[in-house]
Amino acid sequence: MNQQTTLFSNEKLMAMIIPLFLEQLLIMLVGMADTLVVSYAGEAAVSGVSLVNQFNTIFIYLFTALASGGAVVISQYIGRKKNDDAGESASQLLSFSAIFSILIAVMVLIGNEGMLRLMFGKVEDSVMHSCITYLRISAYSYPALAVYNAGAALFRSIGKTSVTMYLSVISNIINVIGNFIGVFVLRAGVAGVAYPSLIARTFSAVMITVLCFQRKNEVFYRCKWIFRWNVDFMKQILKIAIPNGMENGVFQLVKVALSGIVALFGTYQIAANGVAQSIWSLAALAGVAMGPVFITVIGQCMGNGDADAAEHYFKILTRITLLISSAWNLLIFLLTPFFMKFYALQPETKRLVIWLVLIHNVFNAAAYPFSGALSNGLRAAGDVKFTMYVSVISTIAVRLLLSWLLGIVLKMGVIGIAIAMVCDWSIRAVIFFWRQKSGKWKTFQVI
């Protein structure tokens, strides 16, 4: 082990982790506030926003996968002390993200009504009208979202996660205030919810792009790199992004299929599952926040050719993830009875929610640090195909098929689906932990 192992002190790691965690927590809390405000716009607006967000998530995953691929490449070049190459990679990521997202937006704007009727054709006319309005406005924000993700990848790669946190604070304040004005003052219905999101995302995209041009940063954008196509850099980014995007795409499709299975159960089980998922999202914040940290740290170590340092930080980051996840999941579970006071649910439904949260949180603390956060470290080392194959096979063969077997055949309902979910995590956790211990990930080359 050489001096690279001292590159990331405990203080530096915490300076990366805490802003990422707070940013994710803020996004979650603002999302809950948005849901509350949207409910005052009417049931059609609530339904329209909910359905379109399922559709939007597909593209959000694609933009996130692209940014993650960029973050891996940027981190590795930083580790190799080739900051100009890191900057050119970041600039190429910006160019490709902008072009790709504009094409997606144009496609959605042209075919939005047909797409929605194909996916949600049986909904009422008022709901469909809300869907079309919300999707059309949302599509205009795709380029802003992709451009922001590209800039966020740069800042996270250089360890300045506080930048994205502060931008997130400001943009979410804009979003919340805009929603209140749109819904309560202008009474614009679903448009009153959609336009503030467009404005907030555009603000974030413009601000982070301006900040990325500042030459005081370790890595920064340059116009000559943005407008000069470099096939080699894009191949490096897409080599990581495409498998990651395919993995996320399959996961999203399975989620849609699972929603169909849940719809077969009784009303109280559907309600319990919906409430539990909200609490699950809150409980999962610790593991989700650690993902970019693994990418930055392991990516820089491997870029420097120091596999021993990467091995060292795999252990350190995994321990931190386990500790934070365990404490956070325990706290959320203890607060669940308090959360239940805000829901008008039957006692039977509340008891089911608590059981679902218990199942989720135990395994989110014990298994997800390996199946989720640690797998990002493997990707940062270039071991992307293995993680993709394992994740796709496990998602389909374990989560989907086991949900059908336990939930429908054995009549376990949503409890069966929750068990299938944690079985998926556990299997991936064991495989990824074994993969990390095997050292096979040390043999890959990204740049």
Residue ranges and their predicted role:
Residues 25, 29-47, 116-125, 181-188, ...:
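Helix-terminus/linker motif at the lipid-water interface of multi-pass membrane proteins
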Residues 67, 137-156, 164-175, 193-208, ...:
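Short runs within selected transmembrane alpha-helices of multi-pass transporters and secretion channels
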Residues 46-106, 145-164, 259, 270-336, ...:
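Small-residue-rich hydrophobic transmembrane alpha-helices
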Residues 15-34, 137, 148, 171, ...:
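Transmembrane helical elements of multi-pass membrane transporters/channels
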Residues 38-57, 89, 125-130, 190-191, ...:
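Interfacial/gating helices of multi-pass transporter permease domains
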Residues 18, 22, 52-55, 95, ...:
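Hydrophobic residues within alpha-helical transmembrane segments
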Residues 4-36, 40-41, 57-69, 73, ...:
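N-terminal transmembrane alpha-helices
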Residues 1-20, 74-141, 183-242, 298-364, ...:
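Short alpha-helical transmembrane segments in multi-pass integral membrane proteins
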